[in-house]
Amino acid sequence: AQERGCRSAAFTFDRSPREFVTGKPVPLLTTPSERANIIRTQYGVQEVFVEPFDRNMMTMPWEDFISELLVRKYHAVHLVAGHDFRFGHKNEGDVEKLRSYCAAHGLGCDIIPRVEKDGVTVSSTYIRSLLEAGEVKRASEFLGHYFSVEGTVCHGEGIGKKSLFPTANLIPEEHIIALKRGVYATRA
């Protein structure tokens, strides 16, 4: 972005498109505002645009996703996407169509290759499975930052008080992934 004299920006949805399509909740790793904050503070991106995923978004032709949303609305001049990025109605847009569109319309385009750690592809699905299994440290390694969760503290059975370790029972925000039931060491 600096080389082009532009501000860096990231685009994300307020929820997983899979949730809207299937009607089944997909647990989020963060709230949209937490995600935007992580992208800004930990990855140095200047702007983060969070767009609602709805029926209009779901049925938008892939060409319109680029031309109307990314270029016209957000003034994109260079697009960066992951190797498995799919977009537009019925996921008809893919990285090859993105590259082709960008080349034909004078836009820059970079595709980020698959990222692996310890022989495993880094993906939100895998990270969710680690968190659901209670493997928070390993999930944090795949995230590239410590996993954090916010929620409401509620009264429990006083087990922590009896064992001399102060504990807090946390109810995560709605739609946020629930960790495996257990006791976790944290920092406030």
Language model features with spans:
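Core alpha/beta nucleotide-donor-binding catalytic domains of modification enzymes
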Residues: A1-R72
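Active-site cores that bind ATP or allylic diphosphates and position pyrophosphate for catalysis
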Residues: N56, E63-S67, V71-A188
